[in-house]
């Protein structure tokens, strides 16, 4: 018995059979059983890209500690100076992921050091505000800025400088308060406060009136949406479209130009419900919740609002516009919110209720109001409600893969329309709705990097049986889901090679299955642009990672690729606004949104190139100036075309203008040097007050602490903060002396011409005219530092400046007396901006 126990406890020698791992599907095969392509890739249609690499797990078993040492050497250098003061490796020890087939697989530790990218080098960014707690998705603007040291420094400099200036000038103006606007908007009303209508400066007065009208409009948006509904019937008495207007005009427009963007209705059934609703409304002027009239009413209101957007942004004459002008539709969304979210409707769900939620999701995306918010995440909770409602009703992958398994039992009022809607019709509606919900879930992943809420995907061939454009796109879903898993399963170690490969597969298949019908051109345009936007954000994440791991060759390839993508997308926006229009103009309200998302990303990423340009020895002031002018052209295009109508576009213009003025420096003023020295100077000032732990700069840029300590060891006459940054903080900075970035100057030319020089340019107008006029009051204040407005005006630069005059006595950025740090930094700001540049933002 003892012998048997010893034998049982002894290690059994097993045959060593090395395995290989398919890089597509991660299927692991033994050497004698290997088949190329593997069965998974044959099923998924990825035969051409199937190849194997040896599983590092086998190498470990064969070589023991030697392999461990080699793997450790391959791991990227640890990134120090996180917000929590600790250091963490980019590559984790071991992880497990779930493949699309549901198998649990061991992910190889590392294929090579540069294959893995850390999307959250500072950790996941969670913002706590009174109104909301938000964890930002990996590709939203806030996360991009948080990941990039240069953009983080720019944002930190901007916020500190704005705060200093507003504190100095606070009390110089009686702010007019609009309670409907958020806190960040209130001081913007400084432009509304004063001004003589008969002033000789008519241009300034024009700016004031335009700014005020925009503030009032956006304030009304928020006020109308938040209004408390007491009597719906009274609100709708004269403002509900008549039966003839809705059925003969609005619904016809919806079927002709909008329905393919929201293919979730069986139109004959909808018309039946609408006619029943109007029969009751015209007779009693009441809306019965018990009979679900309020659901049909919400559909009518949403379709009307969407058709208003369609006709408004088409910029074409339409008789519908005349009818819409007679209706007060401002309270429609508040009424819908009242019926959907204040009456416990979310405890159960009907088909009509689900369609309302989907229409509301579509409206929030397209509407010029707040909509999806600054980070495009405000509808994420609504999307979760939609998906939960789908699951409750049986709308899932099953209705597409095996629709024959469903049978429908109709009760009550549902039995009254069997001649209109049969069980087979219900199956078709289910399939269209699920395809549409899938599309939205995957689209927001591509735009924002946020994790898909629907965690399953299946290979699905719809050839010859497409019910809608969205149903056709389900063929792409399994690839998009692979991309989601690679990105979100382990954000700190994303396999960039595998992700790019799946992106290429998605683009290739999309080109094969895209519908060429004219009514679907705008849907193809949006999806193609969404894929390009995903690649843009991924390339920027790779760029910041390569800087940290000091991979010079890959960095040079990536930085050129990223710039080419920026230029390509900017040119696409330019053609969209100024080129020939091939798409249905009534779909422009829909495509405007993806273009605004792209333009906003461009306005965020171009400054990152301007700040890095000092590292490229072959690039000088002329190239930097061209980049700044390119930034000005993109901003002018974006804000003039969309800023008058879209709330979030208008709001982002203030920070974009400040960033532009920071970067638009004369030849002898390097903007990166100014930012770096300013932040170091602020750090020194706060260090004297012993408030390091509470300082924003320490939280955002902890690397500056070690940089300051290194600078203190260098004699003053050898002090060069930029050079030390390029060698210590970003060591790759001194390895690009001979690198030349191809700016694609021929593609930049359309942006170097100010198309709005003869008209009103809203991007130019902010600060440049208003601030110089409003600054007159600042002369009479008792602030700690008095501003000389005339000198500031003389030193202020023209927009898109080309030949700046060097300053004879440049300001010393490193003060000798710590007591004067506050005054010195304010003087620095005065030399860069007009006195009230900043007060308009906070």
Swiss-Prot record:
Disordered: region residues: 55-101
Keyword entries, A-Z: Cytoplasm, DNA-binding, Metal-binding, Mitochondrion, Nucleus, Repressor, Transcription, Transcription regulation, Zinc
Main location: cytoplasm
Residues within the DNA-binding region(s): 22-50
Basic and acidic residues bias (residue ranges): 60-71
GO MF annotation list: DNA-binding transcription factor activity, RNA polymerase II-specific; RNA polymerase II cis-regulatory region sequence-specific DNA binding; zinc ion binding
Localization per record: Cytoplasm; Nucleus; Mitochondrion
Compositional bias (Low complexity): 87-99
Gene Ontology biological process terms from the UniProt entry: positive regulation of transcription by RNA polymerase II
Pfam family membership, one: Zn_clus
A GO term from the CC aspect: mitochondrion
Described purpose of this protein according to its UniProt entry: Transcriptional inhibitor with a significantly increased number of target genes in response to oleate.
Similarity comment: family membership: Belongs to the OAF3 family.
Protein name as it appears in the record: Oleate activated transcription factor 3
Gene source species: Zygosaccharomyces rouxii (strain ATCC 2623 / CBS 732 / NBRC 1130 / NCYC 568 / NRRL Y-229)
Gene giving rise to this polypeptide: OAF3
